[in-house]
Amino acid sequence: MVKIGVLALQGAVREHVRCLEAPGVEVSIVKKVEQLEDLDGLVFPGGESTTMRRLIDKYGFFEPLKAFAAQGKPVFGTCAGLILMATRIDGEDHGHLELMDMTVQRNAFGRQRESFETDLIVEGVGDDVRAVFIRAPLIQEVGQNVDVLSKFGDEIVVARQGHLLGCSFHPELTDDRRFHQYFVQMVKEAKTIAQS
């Protein structure tokens, strides 16, 4: 049994919970710092990254979230969650949690009216993964320890750095659970390593 939390400060929380629910997975909605202790993995949902950062600071999550990732526990960030994880944000002096060695650009694919859906090849997940882009960021560049798992044209939209997974789009807004299953597998593998 693995325990995965969805950070519930803002964003598509219930959609992520629905996608994560599976035999052998206990999913919880995380609203308090002390809930992090029992988790094996954590999801940062989409939303608005600046607002999410304000709430992270307000409720004392900043250092505990960094410590959670530093323990080698898997973290999965989608859309605004991806921005929270990046070490660098284009046009800004610094990142937020600065977990993944990458530079992201906010709203890279346009504002809400320019949102779109497409099918993508995502390494380790599938070659027909439905991707819903809503005011999505893109990953401009990644460090040498970061693997690019998917591109839309020439733009990086999914990357992984060890136990950290970042995605520009919203896999939780489709009925395809393969992306979340991929993350669940990351969590199971990390827990096995931690226990050995």
From Swiss-Prot:
L-glutamine binds at G47, E48, S49, R106, I134, R135. It catalyses: aldehydo-D-ribose 5-phosphate + D-glyceraldehyde 3-phosphate + L-glutamine = pyridoxal 5'-phosphate + L-glutamate + phosphate + 3 H2O + H(+); L-glutamine + H2O = L-glutamate + NH4(+). The active site is at C79, H170, E172. Its EC number is 4.3.3.6, 3.5.1.2. Pathway: Cofactor biosynthesis; pyridoxal 5'-phosphate biosynthesis. InterPro entries: Class_I_gatase-like (IPR029062), PdxT/SNO (IPR002161), PdxT/SNO_CS (IPR021196). GO terms for molecular function: glutaminase activity; pyridoxal 5'-phosphate synthase (glutamine hydrolysing) activity. Keywords: Glutamine amidotransferase, Hydrolase, Lyase, Pyridoxal phosphate. One of its GO terms (biological process) is pyridoxal phosphate biosynthetic process. The keyword Lyase applies. GO terms for cellular component: cytosol; glutaminase complex. CDD domains: GATase1_PB. It comes from the Bacteria. It holds the Pfam family SNO. Belongs to the glutaminase PdxT/SNO family. Catalyzes the hydrolysis of glutamine to glutamate and ammonia as part of the biosynthesis of pyridoxal 5'-phosphate. The resulting ammonia molecule is channeled to the active site of PdxS. NCBIfam families: PLP_synth_Pdx2. PANTHER family: PYRIDOXAL 5'-PHOSPHATE SYNTHASE SUBUNIT SNO (PTHR31559), PYRIDOXAL 5'-PHOSPHATE SYNTHASE SUBUNIT SNO1-RELATED (PTHR31559:SF0). HAMAP family: PdxT. In the presence of PdxS, forms a dodecamer of heterodimers. Only shows activity in the heterodimer. This is Pyridoxal 5'-phosphate synthase subunit PdxT.
